């Protein structure tokens, strides 16, 4: 009996080991099957359309830099076959086919034979005809939301993740961004009310100067670092005159339009502004603070280090 029991134990152990090793080909097929089972997916996009993506996209065209950055951050960059001429990040996009700027080259997009086109809510009106032509050509178009807050940026990431079969990576990215943002908020808590600075954000240069008011992610970025938006009484993206800006008299000025600090300080009438008097005019990387994508937290850090160097610069 003991001998027979020993034989059965040996056979059982061998079976377990074989099951554990498995066939590599079978394991690969199993993983592919699991991914296939995710699709089709139906997503309620920013155009209020239920967009069904029947299978995992192999070719993706992005019509907005923020969409592109998200797609690459989710590990889907090898599937991107078309981007706009406005795309600058990551560096790999330089070699990707260009499909126009805000005006979509429909023929070019169709020639790339994409499984999925990532459009954007902010350009819905301008590209309405182009989007219709793409849909008429049988191409799946998903319109990503125009994010104006961190929570909406997270939604954009999750939407693209679901569309591309990268939901897990999207969840990980969102968690990482939230964690990094929390770290910044903790540092900002050390800034007292008396130390808080009013900040004017210039997103478009003179003669047509635009700034950011409330209900924008840039306003939220300032709130996170305990800075006061000098134009907080405005809503959205608004144009302001030189006289109005001088009257606001901000403690700091941040340009996101490529204009250098010295050029701002030389503007007529601006010498009376506190920010200019005390040389607190900063130019930051526009792509970090104006693109509603995965690098937005880096933008918050750059703003914080510029406005409160003693608190945030290590």
UniProtKB/Swiss-Prot annotation:
It is a lipid-anchor. InterPro entries: ABC_Transporter_SBP, ABC_transptr_periplasmic_BD, Vit_B12_bind_prot. The keyword Signal applies. Disulfide bonds: none annotated. Keywords: Cell membrane, Lipoprotein, Membrane, Palmitate, Signal. Residues 1-20 form the signal peptide. The keyword Signal applies. Pfam families: Peripla_BP_2 (PF01497). A lipid is attached at residue 21 (N-palmitoyl cysteine). One of its GO terms (biological process) is cellular response to iron ion. GO terms for cellular component: plasma membrane. Residues 59-311 form the Fe/B12 periplasmic-binding domain. It is found in: Cell membrane. A lipid is attached at residue 21 (S-diacylglycerol cysteine). Probably part of an ABC transporter complex. NCBIfam families: TroA_like. Belongs to the bacterial solute-binding protein 8 family. The complex is composed of two ATP-binding proteins (YvrA), two transmembrane proteins (YvrB) and a solute-binding protein (YvrC). This is Uncharacterized ABC transporter substrate-binding lipoprotein YvrC. It comes from Bacillus subtilis (strain 168). The lineage of its organism: Bacteria, Bacillati, Bacillota, Bacilli, Bacillales.
């Amino acid at each position: 009996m003991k001998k027979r029991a020993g034989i059965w134990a040996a056979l059982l152990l061998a079976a377990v080991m074989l099951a554990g090793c498995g066939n590599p080909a079978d394991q690969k097929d199993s993983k592919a099957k699991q991914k296939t089972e995710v699709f089709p997916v139906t997503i309620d996009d920013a155009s209020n359309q239920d967009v069904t993506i029947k299978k995992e996209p192999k070719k993706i065209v992005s019509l907005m830099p923020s969409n592109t950055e998200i797609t690459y951050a989710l590990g889907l960059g090898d599937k991107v076959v078309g981007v706009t001429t406005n795309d600058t990040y990551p560096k790999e996009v330089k070699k990707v086919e260009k499909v126009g700027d805000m005006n979509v080259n429909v023929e070019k997009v169709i020639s790339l034979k994409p499984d999925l086109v990532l459009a954007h809510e902010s350009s819905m009106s301008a590209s309405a005809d182009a989007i219709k032509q793409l849909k008429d050509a049988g191409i799946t178009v998903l319109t990503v939301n125009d994010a104006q807050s961190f929570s909406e940026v997270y939604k954009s990431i999750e939407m693209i993740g679901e569309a591309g079969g990268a939901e897990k990576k999207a969840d990980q990215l969102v968690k990482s961004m939230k964690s990094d943002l929390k770290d910044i908020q903790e540092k900002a808590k050390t800034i007292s009310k008396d130390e808080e600075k009013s900040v004017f954000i210039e997103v478009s240069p003179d003669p047509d100067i635009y700034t950011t008011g409330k209900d924008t992610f840039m306003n939220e970025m300032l709130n996170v670092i305990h800075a006061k938006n000098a134009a907080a009484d405005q809503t959205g993206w608004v144009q302001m005159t030189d006289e109005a800006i001088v009257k606001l008299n901000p403690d700091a000025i941040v340009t996101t339009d490529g204009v250098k600090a010295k050029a701002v300080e030389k503007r007529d009438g601006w010498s009376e502004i506190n920010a200019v008097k005390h040389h607190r005019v900063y130019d930051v990387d526009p792509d970090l603070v104006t693109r509603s994508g995965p690098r937005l937290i880096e933008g918050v850090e750059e703003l914080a280090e510029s406005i409160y160097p003693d608190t945030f610069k290590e």
